[in-house]
């Protein structure tokens, strides 16, 4: 038995949403509970829009950002909110890997259409990185980069 199989035996892969043992990312039950943002999203930050006649959410229409555009995959509520909390504060790097792959699959067509040539993770302040033990955005970005064959800076 190789090391990977031993690790899976000792620490079986889990669904990042419900934390039940599941070998392939997000389980089917949890997929049904997710609010995937597919349309009617802010053209600046990627949040879902309540007023579908607008291009920008109220926050982005009031302030300037240093980036051109951002996309979000999931709405930050319910089980996703708890899952992301565990990813950030309970050192669940495996969740970050899964979310990175999920983003690559679901946002890959948009990324290719926009002709994005590299992925740049949001830097994390040194104090926060020391406290959390890692930069979750960097792990997500590396996972996306592997799936999409894009460099990560």
Where are these regions (language model features)?
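Glycine-rich phosphate/pyrophosphate-handling loop used in enzymes and phosphotransfer proteins
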Residues: 1-153
